[in-house]
Amino acid sequence: MPSLLLIIFVTELVVQLVNTLGATTINDLLWRIYLTLPTPLSLEFAQQRRKQKEYLAVRHELKATSSQDEFAKWAKLRRQHDKLLEDLEKKKASLEAARTKFDRTLTTTRTVSTRSVQWFLPFWYSKEPMFWLPYGWFPYYVEWFASFPRAPMGSVSIVVWQWACTAVIALMIEAATAALVYVAAKQSQKIRQPVPAQSEKKDS
């Protein structure tokens, strides 16, 4: 079984990443990955794309056909156009329902898997020490706080370890974000910086 230290750290890391990137962004990424897998749903999307190309081709041809000069051809294209449009709308509604179900399942799974760990483990293992502080290194009030709420005195409780993981991960993500913004700004500034014109050489 993985260590409780690692489980708590990974859980808080996942929660912080979701909060930083956004649940919608993560759902979109996982949805695109899911559609690349050989599933019936990905096959439906491929069929929809082919039908959409066919619809656009018929629509283009319909616009280029005169209803007065070529009525028979225009009427045939019109029926084909309406049939394809109806099929596309039905398929779109079906695929949107599948996407909604996917998002709901993903959100529920993510919430249950993270929140259950965040709430259940600290409650269940509240008396278990995560690790022990070096004896005599810290004053009484530090040891009391580290063992809050019910871990043995002189140890670090699972609640305090969870708080520490959350704080450290949040700081790391904030620092990484600031570094990326700084690098991007430097690159943008370098691109915008005008190239100085070379001075003409003086005649000797």
From Swiss-Prot:
KW Transport (keyword) present: yes
Main location group: endoplasmic reticulum
Subcellular location: Endoplasmic reticulum membrane
Spans within the Lumenal topological domain: 1-4, 132-155
Signal peptide: none
Keywords in alphabetical order: Coiled coil, Endoplasmic reticulum, Membrane, Transmembrane, Transmembrane helix, Transport
InterPro entries: Get1, Get1_fungi, Helix_hairpin_bin_sf
GO MF annotation list: protein-membrane adaptor activity
Segments on the Cytoplasmic face: 25-110, 173-204
Transmembrane segments: 5-24, 111-131, 156-172
GO cellular component, one term: GET complex
Ribosomal protein is among the record's keywords: no
Topology class, membrane: Multi-pass membrane protein
Coiled-coil ranges per UniProt: 72-107
Pfam family, one: CHD5
GO biological process, one term: tail-anchored membrane protein insertion into ER membrane
Family: Belongs to the WRB/GET1 family.
Subunit structure of this chain's protein: Interacts with GET3.
Function, as annotated: Required for the post-translational delivery of tail-anchored (TA) proteins to the endoplasmic reticulum. Acts as a membrane receptor for soluble GET3, which recognizes and selectively binds the transmembrane domain of TA proteins in the cytosol.
Protein's name according to its UniProt entry: Protein GET1
Species of provenance: Podospora anserina (strain S / ATCC MYA-4624 / DSM 980 / FGSC 10383)
